[in-house]
Amino acid sequence: FIEEMWGVKLKIIDLAVSTIPSSYLLPGILSAFTCQIPDVYFHSWQSDSLGAVARVLDGSVDLALVGNTFDEPDCCFIPFCKDKLVIATPVNQHYLQYQQKMDSGTLDFSDFLREPFIMRETGSGTKKEIDRYLEKRNIPASSLHIVARMNDLEAIRKSVAGGLGISILSACSAKDLADTHQILMFPLNHESAMRTFYIVYSKNRILKPHVKQFLKFVEHYYK
């Protein structure tokens, strides 16, 4: 329809994008890419990381941007961006005391174990990175006081700001709320508290030249 309406043959790229790349990475990438290559049109679908990779495998999209890797021999996962995991908390006197402990260097992750946690759903890249972090610290997930599980990142952000509990988030998804003093943000100072985002393509498909061009652009965008 768009091709007929504009009367030109567009170069189309179909993307499947997981939650955090969709909201916090893709807008800047697309803006920068289309400044250089203006004759490309994008279709974007948002899902969790697992669902995005499934779309690559079934051929319904050209590429995926996700926050996790999977054991899929038919897919190639290329890292393009790293981000820190942080603990996001409500802004109140209780957590301001935690901030004082952090400033004095006496705060540890174990201090948060008794706090009410809001967790992401299985299938999300963030959830998998949280599981890895807990495993590295020898902390069983069952030891957390989980008060809610949600599959919507924005619902988690608002629930933290509203005082329901705390959550572990990617720093890029919490920064705007921290900057506007709606939440407090505590970095997880551990080597396993980093997460990587990947651009994914199928080894079984021949990528069109403009898709390859976008793939290379994303691969080097944050370097």
Set out the residue ranges of the language-model regions.
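Alpha-helical linker/hinge and terminal dimerization helices associated
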Residues: 1-6, 214, 218
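A late-sequence structural motif
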Residues: 25, 184-223
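Hydrophobic hinge/microswitch elements
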Residues: 48-53, 57-61, 66-67, 129-184
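Short beta-strand->loop
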Residues: 76-86, 104, 145, 179-193
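Short, well-ordered beta-strand segments
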Residues: 12-16, 64, 88, 118, ...
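Immediate post-signal peptide segment of exported/extracytoplasmic ligand-binding proteins
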Residues: 3-13, 105, 111-115
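Central regulatory/effector-binding core of bacterial HTH transcription factors
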Residues: 10-73
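Secondary-structure junction motif
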Residues: 96-99, 103-109, 115-138, 207-208, ...
